[in-house]
């Protein structure tokens, strides 16, 4: 039984019913509709904290989905799960795959930067300043791209870039 049929929350169930109706009415092929069902069930499982089920659904959605924007969104959600589970290298790889599908996803860049910045802090705390600087520079590179894609959307990142001296003036224009 699809996860959406097991949902007891009235609002979620209502949203699911409406989304299903819209998908049925849209002039898209059956394969894309099936991919959407897997994606939707993956989102539901992810929101419930059932990451294994979410990843299974996302994998199935990726097997069916051909649209790069939708594939990128699915991969981004998978990367978020890997990041939540502490699988940071796998998260980075999956965020990169998401960006390969759809390069206009600033949240992927933002999250990659969070991982690089964390690794930089860990290296710095371990007295490995050269490694820390490399990680911080990588964080700055992806965060600069994120800010360019979403100006004003990541004020905390803009402040970090400025306060660490890693800001490019052209980012803000």
Swiss-Prot record:
It is a peripheral membrane protein. GO terms for biological process: photosynthesis. One of its GO terms (cellular component) is plasma membrane-derived thylakoid membrane. Essential for the assembly of the photosystem I (PSI) complex. May act as a chaperone-like factor to guide the assembly of the PSI subunits. Keywords: Membrane, Photosynthesis, Repeat, Thylakoid, TPR repeat. It is found in: Cellular thylakoid membrane. Belongs to the Ycf3 family. InterPro entries: PSI_Ycf3_assembly, TPR-like_helical_dom_sf, TPR_rpt, Ycf3/AcsC/BcsC/TPR_MFPF. Its main location: membrane. Pfam families: TPR_12 (PF13424). This is Photosystem I assembly protein Ycf3. SMART domains: TPR. TPR repeats lie at residues 35-68, 72-105, 120-153. It comes from Synechococcus sp. (strain CC9902). It comes from the Bacteria. Gene3D superfamilies: Tetratricopeptide repeat domain.
């Amino acid at each position: 039984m699809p996860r959406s049929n097991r949902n007891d929350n009235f609002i979620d169930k209502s949203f699911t019913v409406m989304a299903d109706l819209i998908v049925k009415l849209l002039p898209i092929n059956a394969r894309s509709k099936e991919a959407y069902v897997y994606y939707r069930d993956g989102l539901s499982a992810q929101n419930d904290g059932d990451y294994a089920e979410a990843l299974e659904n996302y994998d199935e959605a990726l097997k069916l989905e051909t649209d790069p924007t939708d594939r990128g969104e699915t991969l981004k959600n998978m990367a978020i799960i890997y990041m939540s589970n502490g699988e940071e290298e796998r998260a980075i790889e999956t965020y990169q795959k998401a960006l390969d599908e759809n390069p206009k996803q600033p949240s992927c860049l933002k999250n990659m930067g969070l991982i690089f910045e964390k690794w930089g802090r860990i290296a710095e705390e371990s007295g490995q300043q050269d490694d820390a600087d490399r990680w911080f520079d990588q964080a700055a590179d992806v965060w600069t791209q994120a800010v360019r894609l979403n100006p004003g959307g990541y004020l905390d990142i803009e402040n970090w870039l400025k306060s660490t001296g890693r800001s490019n003036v052209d980012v803000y224009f």
